[in-house]
């Protein structure tokens, strides 16, 4: 069973990384097509969509999986399937209610937000609000059967169709105006959800014979009433939903505050939307890119720490925790300082179709948000560590504290004319900074350990500073000779090479650290063979 669990975790982990990469790559061409105006409309709809989906579905796949798994474990296949049917009907009704609510209220919602042109972006997501809850029921059912491939496959197909259909419709509708084109991008999410649902439904239909065979093998079956199933599902899913809702709630409140506060200090609806698009649709996209690697680390940490904790192997547990934090900083620090050092050149390289005002504003936002990469990647890994230690609620509480601080700062700072949209960026960095510090304190408390400050923090910091400094100097030297775009690419390559050298020189990384990365075991053996690491 342990092998099945690890295999399942690996399958979902790989799928999660693929989905993250597709999502990150999607935003870059999209931003160049609909620019900051369109990204403002798009990003007005998505936080609301994410929040509604989180509330209606977040905890249910896990709850369904838990109840199905428990019933199957005692041979009660009949009631295991009954759990799935009850959950499917409940999520179907939830999807109908949520999608109808947005369909009827979409115009009122965007007007209250102060961004009326976001109507098409929001209304285009209505089908997804219906399809995704149904898909969540199927995913929970298969996860309860220790079959993670259907979930992983549906996730990848969903994201692939979202990207392809979204970009296609954006191009197709561009002549109809930016609001309509942004709606086309949003509709890609609905088509992706439909594609994912179709795939997992096909898997279910093809496997119905196996399910029927299981039902005939039922050894024991008590009277598991529908109202009790609903109660059990809610008892498991509600706490999970509350924890998962922190970030969507934070983003939604941020959306409301930022747009309204900018308009209160004299910005028109269009200008406020454009600035919001610079923040959420362009600068924040780059901040999320390093998560592709930090998510992979987080996935590795949970089972590794849980296993060491279960064996009561304290030395192994402390080594894994230290390596997890160090390797996270080895990713987060250079990404943060590199984005800060080359903020303007990177924005000019990636968002070249936007006007100069947009590029300048987005570069300033990126220079502020770049420091958030350190805290955001830390929050992911530290949350995984706390989950491995059996404290899953703690990181959610810590993130909630950060979210409260973000709301207060966003409200206060964005209404100051000299600060405006930059206050929202600063509040985001502060929120994740607070959460990461609280998570770090919690890890030290529950793991009852001290971290080696030199190896975990100082050495990675020195290497990252050296990398960022040389990358900046390389760009400054080359820009007059090669132009901005080529100089940016060369500076990044130079920075990466120097960073690798500095890691080896300072002894910032060990072969054990590499084991937490995808294919890290093979990489660790390779560097040991050539004695690249001390």
Model-based region annotation:
Residues 1-22, 78, 82, 220-251, ...:
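N-terminal membrane topogenesis motif
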Residues 4-62, 92, 99, 103, ...:
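Signature of the first transmembrane helix
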Residues 473-534:
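Membrane-proximal transmembrane or re-entrant/amphipathic helices at the cytosolic face
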Residues 97-117, 336-355:
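Short membrane-interface helical motifs at transmembrane helix boundaries
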Residues 69-88, 275-370:
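Specific pore-lining/lateral-gate transmembrane helices of multi-pass inner-membrane transport
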Residues 132-154, 371-401:
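Membrane-interface junctions at transmembrane-helix termini in multi-pass inner-membrane proteins
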Residues 149, 160-203, 393, 403-437, ...:
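Membrane-interface helix-loop junctions in multi-pass transport and translocation proteins
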Residues 115-137, 355-382:
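Alpha-helical transmembrane segments of multi-pass membrane proteins
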